[in-house]
Amino acid sequence: MLSILKKLFGTANDRTVKKLFSEITKINSLEPAIQKLSDEELKNKTVEFKEKLKNGATLDDIVYEAFAVVREAARRVCGMRHFDVQLIGGLILHRGMITEMRTGEGKTLVATLPAYLNALTGKGVHVVTVNDYLASRDSASMGKIYNFLGLSVGCIVAGMPDEAKRAAYNADITHATNNELGFDYLRDNMKYSLQERVLRPFNFAIIDEVDSILIDEARTPLVISGPVNDNSELYGKIDKIVRMLNTSDFEKDEKLKTINLTETGITHIESLLSKEHLIKPDTGLYDFENLTLVHYVNQALRAHNMFTVDVDYLVREGKVMIIDEFTGRVMEGRRYSEGLHQALEAKENVKIQNENQTLASITFQNYFRNYPKLSGMTGTAMTEAPELKDIYNLDVVAVPTHNKVTRLDLDDEIYGSKKEKYDAILKLIKDCYDRGQPILVGTISIEKSEELSSVLNKEKIPHKVLNAKFHEQEAFIIAQAGRFKAVTIATNMAGRGTDIMLGGNPEMLIEQLDEDHNYETKAAEIKAQISEEKKQVIEAGGLFVIGTERHESRRIDNQLRGRSGRQGDPGKTKFFLSLDDDLMRIFASDRISGVLRTLGLKDGEAIHHPMISRSLEKAQQKVEGHNYEMRKNLLRFDDVMNDQRKIIYEQRTEIIKSKDSHGFLNSTTEELAKKIVLTFMPVGSYREDWDIENLSVELHRVFSMKFDHNLVSKNDVTEEEITKIVIQTAHDIYKSKEEAYSSELMHNAVKYILLTTLDQVWKDHLYSLDHLRQGISLRAYAQKDPLSEYKREAFNLFEQMLNNLKELFIQTVYHFHIDLKHIQKEDVSLEHKKLQKNMRESREDPAFSKYNAGSSLETDLKPVVSRVDPKDRNPDDPTSWGRVSRNELCPCGSGKKYKYCHGANE
């Protein structure tokens, strides 16, 4: 019934596209007039548009004319004219939606339309791609259009210095990778001045391969971390022990990707740990004193049994490198967290790097939700439309192709074993190769790629292998996969970003030439050869795409299919499956095996059956649903941290912008002073209950004050009066610092202390949240909702962090010392980095000028003394020693630390 209604009235997508086609006529009607403009007049349209926007016009008021201008500029500069369907794609992107356009439909050119239009506001546009190569390529090729129209273009790639990044981000349109954008956002929020930051405020982002970035990579947070304690030796010992376990010692669930020790496994591993003296003979692994070892054991178990080399990671140059399960690419600079990476390094017997502590992190889900306006484009998004709408509030519109798709998608062939499947694949490859038809074989892992490659080598069939191990050659290899007799094996084709042109890509081949006197001749020969090969390939049937097994996601399978049949080219696709494939074995084996038994499948025979196709689709839907729930759950938890992150980053920015740091200092000083006094002299308490001894200790610890006990002996003194005196004295102490150093220097010092203290407590807070998150799922056993528990405890931790911030900040302000000897007199403002260096030398050993306010409290301060070179110290003359650290050996030559010798009374 539903299908009949759709045929009668069309789908919602059909109606949207039909409406957009009516708008395209408005753009097309402007084309004749725009074409008559001179280059100078066409360029001046940008100035005209900006003037209109300044006078109150909106982007929607100028959208049709702006698109017509970009179309004409592209025709003149690049020789490319936007098709009507590309204009539709541009309108969809401008309106903050996702456009699904088939491979080869010119998504890169489509992005120029909304990028130009939105850049006219002067707030910047980010065009996001999945790797540096694509960012550089697109900024260079499409940048010609923007530059012609008077807009600036920037490109961000890994390893650029901040100055270059800042200039690129300040351009009207910036091409960048999703990783660099996320990391730059985190880095900016660790800087100490606004001038050091590279990013501008968020405005508009166009994401290429949007499904890859917002869905496939959604579960992988970007993390900036620093090293913690070195436990490499322990990882090595645990690895040796785990290797001795039997398969009966643990049980794993491949669907849920979990692994746990069995009862016999616990007994076995406790015995092994005891022999290695890692636990005492009379204790168990789960005894309180041994609980830290559980973490190491679990990660070693996962490393050996849930992660496979050349599938989940590869080892290159003595390093374990993560492979993106969706794209087959190496994830440069990424490491598994929670000790898993160290466990893998121990497993592969390479150098074990230190564990890292998180300093800052964010998921792509929360990073991209910062943009007020977000859009994206991809060849495959409709299958994930509900998730994109639910999480990012992005609608998906499928745009029809410019030319009709003539590709033939053949039915899957299912075999009983992997060997039979490979035999069938080999037979087809041989047939295509003999006829000259180019073949692209898609695999789901590097391991499978190399397995198939070795089979082809034995048969002496020349071929290219494209996977994470040869990332540098990726674009060139894939661009030539459409040549006559070409055989290309590739891991997942998601996000490759390079078209496969039948006959090959002449431009890329020409780029390989040396510019000698024969350059033009050789270039012409290449073009002629490619043109001839294109005819031969079309006659042979176009590109034949072979899938060696189904992926968990239908979308990834569709991306592989989409490599064939670009822009109306002929082509074929076919998937070969076996009961040994992971997806079949884990999710659909029982049902399909039953069908095969019923049908009486013989060795070497293939089967085509609608029930099997339905079972496979259900299995994929089941996995997709499971992964969606995992991403949604991750987001619910990450939103808790994201709310806190926003507060901290906003506060940090306010501190940096602040021209007067005294407000927070004074209010916090008063708050802590009251808190300390009331802790030891509670309101309404008797005098004999006052804890004056500990009050003195606490005031000394926080404010470096000496409390006059005689003050309490006055009969009429109250806790309120004591509080007022403490507050006033604290303010006076600070004023004495301003007199000693200058108010501007102190302002910068206080601001710097506040920023560094905030960074420290935030880092510790992230560490606490990580630990809370790891164990929170166990609350479900106590009939408690883990998410609610996480929210509650995360809020308590956040409050605790803010209290720690205040105390640590005040304590540091009242105890720090600046070594004036290392500061030039004219440099009153003092750069943060120089201040950091001087403060690090002295924070452990506060020393100040003597101060007495004439009140009953006096400060425990010393004269400001600079450091002296040890060789200039006279052991018999303490006045020549200068400032001595309390932990240094005493200059008198006694051999004792200074704090136990001449510094004992300080």
From Swiss-Prot:
It is an enzyme of class 7 (translocase). The keyword Lipid biosynthesis does not apply. It comes from the Bacteria. Monomer and homodimer. Part of the essential Sec protein translocation apparatus which comprises SecA, SecYEG and auxiliary proteins SecDF-YajC and YidC. Its cofactor is Zn(2+). It catalyses: ATP + H2O + cellular proteinSide 1 = ADP + phosphate + cellular proteinSide 2. This is Protein translocase subunit SecA. The gene is secA.
